[in-house]
């Protein structure tokens, strides 16, 4: 993560608070590097199932280098080289790829893979799993595909009412969650679930990933000091959307999600002295720097980085690419 250029003095009274940590997490870094390394090693095209990460800039940049993004493995030609996205896939997707002799490289975040293994383990132990997540998200689809019969989606507190009645009498009941949710919202859902299902068990460890939690804590640390929060991230990025919600819930008067600096509306600045900036876990730092430069045009030329945690986690590349270093 490159450091922001910090002006030596406040010239206008207008200020930027820059949340840290922000941007790329270890899982995203690994996934993007997997596609880049595959392109170097095998040449273009490299097919990628779904968006490798939920960021428009990253996807467009990789496409320019020779990645071809498809919705399903079946759309790639026989024997193609394919990377599965950071969000993880179900066993059925692996089977579809194998049926076409596709050489698949799984770039699933290891923390998502951990949840897959938990689902498999609890299924074998006879548990029904209440999976807290957002319907239609690739991570949710991939995870639930590891236990189709015994995993039940809970999409928000409202989703509790849609759960099947037989679960009321199910003694072996446990909850798990998508890795990119709001920590506070997830705990609220768990509390409501335990009202309806007193027998509900907690998992051995929290599934919400370290990067998601750290970025939410970093936003909380500055939100109360900001009239406006700008989160850099794509609208299909669950963790980026959650950062906007966290900012609003913790003191920011307004919060907006932007992919690029050009999307910023100067009307947002009316009456605003302090602007907070953060970015989702799939956002490269170059996009944050673009926002800082854009705000400087409007007099926000004093930048203070507020650090709430240090991140040193690095994930190894998929095994097939490790010897290519």
Curated annotation (Swiss-Prot):
One GO BP: isopentenyl diphosphate biosynthetic process, methylerythritol 4-phosphate pathway
Binding site for isopentenyl diphosphate: 54, 87, 137, 237-239, 282
Pathway involvement of the protein, from the record: Isoprenoid biosynthesis; dimethylallyl diphosphate biosynthesis; dimethylallyl diphosphate from (2E)-4-hydroxy-3-methylbutenyl diphosphate: step 1/1; Isoprenoid biosynthesis; isopentenyl diphosphate biosynthesis via DXP pathway; isopentenyl diphosphate from 1-deoxy-D-xylulose 5-phosphate: step 6/6
Domain of life: Bacteria
Record-listed [4Fe-4S] cluster binding positions: 25, 109, 209
Binding site for dimethylallyl diphosphate: 54, 87, 137, 237-239, 282
Catalytic residues identified in the record: 139
InterPro entries reported in the protein's UniProt record: LytB/IspH
Reaction it catalyzes: isopentenyl diphosphate + 2 oxidized [2Fe-2S]-[ferredoxin] + H2O = (2E)-4-hydroxy-3-methylbut-2-enyl diphosphate + 2 reduced [2Fe-2S]-[ferredoxin] + 2 H(+); dimethylallyl diphosphate + 2 oxidized [2Fe-2S]-[ferredoxin] + H2O = (2E)-4-hydroxy-3-methylbut-2-enyl diphosphate + 2 reduced [2Fe-2S]-[ferredoxin] + 2 H(+)
EC number: 1.17.7.4
Pfam families: LYTB (PF02401)
Entry's cofactor comment: Binds 1 [4Fe-4S] cluster per subunit.
Function: Catalyzes the conversion of 1-hydroxy-2-methyl-2-(E)-butenyl 4-diphosphate (HMBPP) into a mixture of isopentenyl diphosphate (IPP) and dimethylallyl diphosphate (DMAPP). Acts in the terminal step of the DOXP/MEP pathway for isoprenoid precursor biosynthesis.
Protein name (record): 4-hydroxy-3-methylbut-2-enyl diphosphate reductase
